[in-house]
C-alpha cells in the first residue's frame, strides 16, 4: 500500500497555511517562526520598520511614475514569493502526479506557505525603505493606482482564482472566495474614487499599461494580504 499524502490534501493544507496564518488559526501547530520573519507578524510593528514617516499626500496630489514605482516593485517582490512556492509544489509533484510520498517534505511546504503573508510584508518594507516612501504614501498610491487602472473587485477575484489554479495545479475544481470584509471596503473606496472624477486623464493613461501587470503579478497585494492582521479565504468544490 502506498504511504504518503495525496496532493489534493496537501494543496488544501497549503491554502490553509497561506490564508490561516495571519489569523493565528493554523501556525501554532507548527514550529516557531524563523527569527528573521517573526517581526512581520503584526501590522503595527511592520509599519514601524519603514524609515519614512511622510504623511498621506494631499487631495491635490496626482499619480506619477515615481509614485507608482513602489507598488510595482512590491508586486514583483510578492510574485517572487508565489513563484517559489509554485516551484516547491512542482518539485514535490514531479515524481508522482497523484501522491506526495514524502509526508515530511509536504509538511515543510505547508510551513513555508504559512510564511507567505509575512514574506510579502517584508518585501513591501524593503521596497519602501529603498525608495524612501512611507506606508501612508504607499497606501495612497496603491488605492489611487488601482482606481486609475480600472481594477474592480470582480477582476481581482478572477485573478486570484487563476493564481491559485496556476500555482497549486490540481485545484481546478476548487473555488476560491474572499469574503467581503476589508477587501470589499477597499474596492468600494476605489470604485467611488474612480466614479467621483477625482482621477484625471493623465492618471488613467499612466496606469493603463500596468493594469494587467498588477493582475498577473500583484494579486496578493490587490487582495490586501500585506495590509491586514486577519484574512479569510473560503475554498469550496
Regions found by a protein language model. Give the residues of each.
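Positively charged n-region of N-terminal signal peptides that target proteins for export
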Residues: 1-4
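Hydrophobic membrane-insertion alpha-helices, especially the h-region
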Residues: 7-25
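A cross-kingdom marker for long, charged
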Residues: 21, 192-237
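Immediate post-signal-peptide N-terminus of mature secreted/exported proteins
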Residues: 24-90, 94, 226-237
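Short acidic alpha-helix initiation/capping motifs at coil-to-helix transition points
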Residues: 48-49, 115-121, 182-185
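Mid-length scaffold segments of soluble, non-membrane domains
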Residues: 96-158
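A charged, solvent-exposed segment within the mature domains of Sec-exported extracytoplasmic proteins
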Residues: 131-210
Amino acid at each position: 500500500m502506498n504511504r504518503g499524502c495525496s496532493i489534493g490534501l496537501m494543496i488544501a493544507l497549503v491554502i490553509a497555511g497561506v490564508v490561516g496564518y495571519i489569523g493565528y488559526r493554523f501556525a501554532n501547530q507548527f514550529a516557531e517562526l524563523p527569527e528573521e520573519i517573526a517581526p512581520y507578524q503584526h501590522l503595527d510593528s511592520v509599519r514601524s520598520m519603514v524609515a519614512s514617516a511622510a504623511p498621506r499626500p494631499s487631495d491635490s496630489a496626482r499619480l506619477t511614475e515615481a509614485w507608482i514605482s513602489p507598488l510595482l516593485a512590491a508586486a514583483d517582490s510578492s510574485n517572487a514569493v508565489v513563484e517559489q512556492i509554485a516551484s516547491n509544489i512542482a518539485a514535490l509533484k514531479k515524481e508522482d502526479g497523484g501522491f506526495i510520498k514524502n509526508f515530511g517534505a509536504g509538511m515543510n511546504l505547508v510551513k513555508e506557505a504559512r510564511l507567505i503573508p509575512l514574506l510579502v510584508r517584508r518585501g513591501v518594507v524593503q521596497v519602501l525603505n529603498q525608495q524612501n516612501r512611507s506606508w501612508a504614501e504607499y497606501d495612497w498610491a496603491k488605492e489611487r493606482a488601482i482606481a486609475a487602472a480600472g481594477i474592480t473587485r470582480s477582476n481581482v477575484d478572477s485573478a486570484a482564482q487563476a493564481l491559485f489554479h496556476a500555482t497549486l495545479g490540481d485545484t481546478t475544481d476548487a473555488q476560491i472566495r474572499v469574503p467581503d470584509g476589508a477587501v470589499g471596503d477597499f474596492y468600494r473606496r476605489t470604485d467611488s474614487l474612480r466614479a467621483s472624477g477625482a482621477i484625471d486623464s493623465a492618471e488613467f493613461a499612466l496606469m493603463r499599461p500596468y493594469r494587467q501587470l498588477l493582475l498577473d503579478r500583484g494579486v496578493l497585494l490587490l487582495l490586501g494580504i500585506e495590509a491586514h492582521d486577519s484574512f479569510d479565504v473560503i475554498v469550496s468544490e
